[in-house]
């Protein structure tokens, strides 16, 4: 709480800034304002530097008009998140630093990939095996740290939604699950980021829901009432989640159809990895699969498409990920986007219902 602590030096009444709910609101507004105010300048700079999106010529013909649209706008999202968290979160909380390490680490991987593609004009970007290698290094490192530093068995137990008191201990399997959740979610959001605003809105919705999970899990009264494990460190993740919401909404201002900027891998890989680590920390990995159902379906469509083509020589979809399939069926891009948003809203509500339905 850099800003809150600084303000209290001048006026004791500024202790009000130590309240979690107020800091959550301020975190949202700070990230939102950073994104909205810096966005136009960043877009102009990206245009000046000719950092534009390249478009596949075998995809929907309507996408050819997107060629040259500024990309790597994810830098704006990440900057807004990091600044907001540093200002309003309790920096003595190790969960905050674990989450920021994933934000920055996966952001760097995405940045290198984008830089190679759009600046050095290398269509392959960061070679896939190296991308997965560094994603794995970060994910396994974080998983091992969490396993070694656990202070409560509940921190590494599997919380099963809809069932009361079902929390099997995972042991070292916690490390394996954490790895797959972080890396899998990172790549799932990356695959979803193919239409204007398609990935950022589900990300904002899931982050907003996780803010509620983090708050209830980190509050001894709410956790007891809802019969979920009490993990006090998760309360500060509310600030991280609300920063994602604010930064995401600010970015959506420029990314909504027709997009003025794309987030690029620097944004999608980092946001996906961040949702993954937050799910792990609040012990809601299974609920992430529910709330992030759009990400799951997009990923499964790619896996099924590739598997079917290799095994049978036939494609299941006209094009994968599945949002392109609907475009090639004749759906206008805005229809695809909004319907996927609606599905995300429904799935997030189902996920939130697991808090009470046990």
Swiss-Prot record:
Its cofactor is Mg(2+). Keywords: Cell cycle, Cell division, Cell inner membrane, Cell membrane, Cell shape, Cell wall biogenesis/degradation, Magnesium, Membrane, Metal-binding, Peptidoglycan synthesis, Transferase, Transmembrane, Transmembrane helix. It catalyses: UDP-N-acetyl-alpha-D-muramoyl-L-alanyl-gamma-D-glutamyl-meso-2,6-diaminopimeloyl-D-alanyl-D-alanine + di-trans,octa-cis-undecaprenyl phosphate = di-trans,octa-cis-undecaprenyl diphospho-N-acetyl-alpha-D-muramoyl-L-alanyl-D-glutamyl-meso-2,6-diaminopimeloyl-D-alanyl-D-alanine + UMP. Pathway: Cell wall biogenesis; peptidoglycan biosynthesis. GO terms for cellular component: plasma membrane. It is found in: Cell inner membrane. One of its GO terms (molecular function) is metal ion binding. The chain crosses the membrane at residues 19-39, 71-91, 95-115, 126-146, 166-186, 194-214, 237-257, 261-281, 286-306, 336-356. Pfam families: Glycos_transf_4, MraY_sig1. Its main location: membrane. Its EC number is 2.7.8.13. The keyword Amino-acid biosynthesis does not apply. It is a multi-pass membrane protein. GO terms for biological process: cell division; cell wall organization; peptidoglycan biosynthetic process; regulation of cell shape. Belongs to the glycosyltransferase 4 family. MraY subfamily. Catalyzes the initial step of the lipid cycle reactions in the biosynthesis of the cell wall peptidoglycan: transfers peptidoglycan precursor phospho-MurNAc-pentapeptide from UDP-MurNAc-pentapeptide onto the lipid carrier undecaprenyl phosphate, yielding undecaprenyl-pyrophosphoryl-MurNAc-pentapeptide, known as lipid I. This is Phospho-N-acetylmuramoyl-pentapeptide-transferase.
